[in-house]
């Protein structure tokens, strides 16, 4: 009666994990000298013989169980099987908080955050050419669209990516009009331009765009124009109020007889 050999040992362990789509290595085991290793699938189909086992597939996520035995080269007695589990982990679903596109005004800062992982790294640079990082405010290059890509890694060490287009738009060129001179008591109407369709205007001094008013003293008014993207620009106009001169006097008087 020949003894049944002990099960082989697997290097590095009998549990191996990969990320979906990763390049897998062939399984390996250590046998007793003079013994032959045999590799089986979970249905006991022979896959390979020798110290180098099959290469696990990583095309689908999930766990697969393999079996490995060792056979005495003399007695041909085969050991019990050592179970080897290979787990293929799905890639994390990584996204950018706020969506795939965001618009900012030239010179304004933005903060980008990844979602779906436990750690993140970003590609792309700010307006000064410095690398950006997750959750850190930065100013993107002006008047252009820049694509930033985040790589998110989950707790299994598996990574995936997502991208966002950051559109930096030029500030509107706001025009408050030419300086105005009026006489005291006269009305004036100030109207701004440059904010474009869907834009709006606000004036200092409590006046309204396009609405006449009667200033009492010379004043410089500041116009703030906001375009459809929420970007703002300013301009100023001075309204000079000239005093009304007094009536002339008549010499010798304003009543004359002939």
What annotation goes with each model-predicted range?
Residues 1-5, 85-90, 164-170, 237-243:
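Interdomain boundary/hinge segments at the C-termini of tandem beta-sandwich modules
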Residues 4-13, 91-99, 171-177, 244-252:
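Proline-enriched interdomain boundary motifs that mark the N-terminal boundary
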Residues 19, 74-81, 105, 155-161, ...:
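Short, exposed coil/turn segments at beta-strand boundaries within extracellular/luminal domains
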Residues 21-31, 106-116, 186-195, 257:
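A short beta-strand segment in extracellular, disulfide-stabilized domains
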Residues 31-41, 116-124, 195-205:
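Solvent-exposed loop segments of extracellular immunoglobulin-like
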Residues 49-66, 132-149, 209-222:
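Solvent-exposed segments in extracellular or luminal domains encompassing
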């Amino acid at each position: 009666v020949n003894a049944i050999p002990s099960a082989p040992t697997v290097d590095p362990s009998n549990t191996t994990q990969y990320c979906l789509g990763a390049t897998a290595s062939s399984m390996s085991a250590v046998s007793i000298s003079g013994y032959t290793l045999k590799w089986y699938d979970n249905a006991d189909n022979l896959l390979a013989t020798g110290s180098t086992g099959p290469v696990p597939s990583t095309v689908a996520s999930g766990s697969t169980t393999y079996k490995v035995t060792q056979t005495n080269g003399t007695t041909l007695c085969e050991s019990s099987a050592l179970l080897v589990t290979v787990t293929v982990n799905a890639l994390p679903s990584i996204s950018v908080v706020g969506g795939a596109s965001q618009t900012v005004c030239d010179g304004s800062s933005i903060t980008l955050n990844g979602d779906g992982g436990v750690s993140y790294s970003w590609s792309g640079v700010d307006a000064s050419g410095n690398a950006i990082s997750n959750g850190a405010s930065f100013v993107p290059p002006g008047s252009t669209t820049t694509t930033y890509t985040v790589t998110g890694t989950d707790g299994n060490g598996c990574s995936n990516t997502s991208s966002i287009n950051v559109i930096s738009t030029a500030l509107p060129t706001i025009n408050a009009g030419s300086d105005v001179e009026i006489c005291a008591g006269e009305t004036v109407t100030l109207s701004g331009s440059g904010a474009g369709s869907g834009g709006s205007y606000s004036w200092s001094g409590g006046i309204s765009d396009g609405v006449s008013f009667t200033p009492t003293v010379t004043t410089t008014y500041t116009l703030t124009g906001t375009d459809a993207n929420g970007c703002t620009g300013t301009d100023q106009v001075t309204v000079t109020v000239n005093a009304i001169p007094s009536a002339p006097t008549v010499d010798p008087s304003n009543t004359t007889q002939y």
